[in-house]
Amino acid sequence: MSETVKFTCQRVPREIGAFTGFAELNEYRRKLRELGMIGVDANGIGFGNLSIRDGATSRFYITGSGTGGTADLIPSDYARVVAYDFAKNWLRCEGPTVASSESLTHAAVYESEPTVFSVIHGHDVKLWAALLEEEATATPKGVEYGTPEIAYAVRNLFKVTDMERRKILQWPGMKEGSWHLGEMREKRLGRYSDRRSEAKCSVAAMLYVTPV
């Protein structure tokens, strides 16, 4: 998957300080990098991204574009998405970096389900194949990443499937890709157990699995 940003981004340069959930999200990201679900491919293109809702709003913090190869992120490696328009394929973000190419898909999740507090998009061919075999909730084939179509598809899946309950989404058109959605529980991130390795940390997330 290319990390090329396809949307029009209006970036407002602004310092990003440590936000609520920053440490927990980074810890989960480190574990996913160890598993190879986030990183850089043979062509030097980064893959995988994480985000966390900004309080009870539809705004969110998301890893910046091209950060897959960075071992440990600091607050300035994140962008705060404050507005978006699916039809115009546009978003506004704050911070020193451009928001991840998957930002509009994350926005579709937060807009569709208020209980989701974090979103993780990771790449793992084994998990992707397992989800494909069990016919997990999936986006339509042929829908490209970073487009209004994928955002609309995700919103529709919340309406017509049990994704709200399962909190995992597979992307058939992107081998190894999946998404995990998390809930906010008592103002804290819950615990999520990675299905492949059983590695645990304090972040609960919706996983969106796509292949590399």
Describe the predicted segments one by one.
Residues 1-212:
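Glycine-rich flexible loops
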